[in-house]
């Protein structure tokens, strides 16, 4: 197994891409810690969901939160796993959780920065200032916070893999997605800069650039808009979470040891503008 003996942290791992990533890393041999702002057993989950927007409210109220279930499934594979509550915008909490992972598991080798928010599509004049600020805090600063917290542990071991979740919205733009597109473009810039810094410590830093992926969030979207986006892909269909997860396992492995600073499109060719 290509990731045997490695310890991975997946942020935003309770559903969708994060859940698929966690399971795929475990199948490849890694021990996996899942973090999310929503946990099934959290008695304050409804309050947390309300704080972080309509998508989280819907997922929490509909029972579409699987962080602890996913950890159980991973342990049933014979791997070590736990689910921890984490708000990536809280720097002190991020440092505490990453330190706990290292203490409990002995190392912290792989970081998957998947935690993000996208729950509003509005044109510029209707963009709420507080949602702009929130998206920056979660999607971009949250990624920075997690990278900074794990960096010393990876440097100490002389090995590390950081994989950041970007988006075609960050490379192509998105109508009515000024805040989301800006944060994901920022993630790509952060990825390249950290790749340069990490190389001297044998830490690779790459980004996945998903296109239209069949997740809970996608299925919540406007059906006509979803159809238009699907028809722009070369395959004329959405990808599956496992398509992202398989790319992540590759980038986390030594098969990708000479790859860094790369935005890897897993997008079905949506950026090709096929006709």
List each language-model region with its residue ranges.
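Substrate-binding pocket helix/loop in short-chain dehydrogenase/reductase
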Residues: 94, 122-124, 128-136, 218, ...
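Short C-terminal tail/terminal secondary-structure segment
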Residues: 121, 172, 232, 249, ...
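Residue(s) in the substrate-gating loop at a strand-loop-helix junction
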Residues: 167
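Alpha-helical segment proximal to the catalytic Tyr-Lys
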Residues: 152, 196-197, 257
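Active-site helix of classical SDR
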Residues: 147, 183, 191
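Short, small/polar-rich loop/turn modules that mediate ligand/substrate recognition or access, typified
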Residues: 199, 204, 259-261
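Short-chain dehydrogenase/reductase
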Residues: 1-105, 119-122, 130-131
């Amino acid at each position: 197994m290509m990731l045997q003996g490695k310890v991975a942290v997946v942020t935003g791992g309770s559903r969708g891409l994060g859940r698929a990533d966690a399971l795929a890393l475990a199948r490849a041999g890694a021990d996996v810690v899942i973090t999310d702002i929503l946990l099934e057993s959290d008695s304050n989950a409804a309050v947390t969901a309300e704080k972080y927007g309509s998508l989280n409210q819907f997922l929490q109220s509909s029972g579409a939160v699987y962080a602890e279930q996913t950890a159980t499934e991973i342990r049933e594979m014979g791997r070590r796993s736990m689910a921890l509550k984490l708000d990536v915008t809280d720097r002190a909490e991020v440092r505490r959780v990453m330190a706990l992972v290292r203490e409990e598991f002995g190392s912290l080798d792989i970081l998957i920065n998947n935690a993000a928010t996208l729950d509003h599509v509005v044109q510029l004049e209707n963009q709420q200032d507080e949602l702009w600020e929130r998206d920056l805090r979660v999607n971009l600063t949250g990624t920075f916070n997690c990278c900074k917290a794990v960096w010393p542990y990876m440097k100490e071991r002389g090995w590390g893999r950081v994989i950041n979740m970007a988006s075609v919205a960050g490379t192509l733009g998105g109508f009515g997605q000024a805040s989301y597109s800006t944060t994901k473009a920022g993630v790509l810039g952060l990825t390249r800069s950290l790749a340069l810094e990490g190389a001297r410590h044998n830490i690779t830093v790459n980004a996945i650039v998903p296109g239209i992926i069949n997740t809970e969030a996608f299925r919540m979207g406007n059906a006509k808009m979803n159809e238009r986006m699907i028809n722009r892909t070369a395959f004329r269909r959405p990808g599956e979470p496992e398509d992202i997860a398989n790319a992540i396992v590759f980038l986390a492995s030594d098969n990708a040891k000479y790859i860094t600073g790369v935005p890897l499109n897993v997008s079905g060719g949506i950026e090709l503008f096929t006709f």
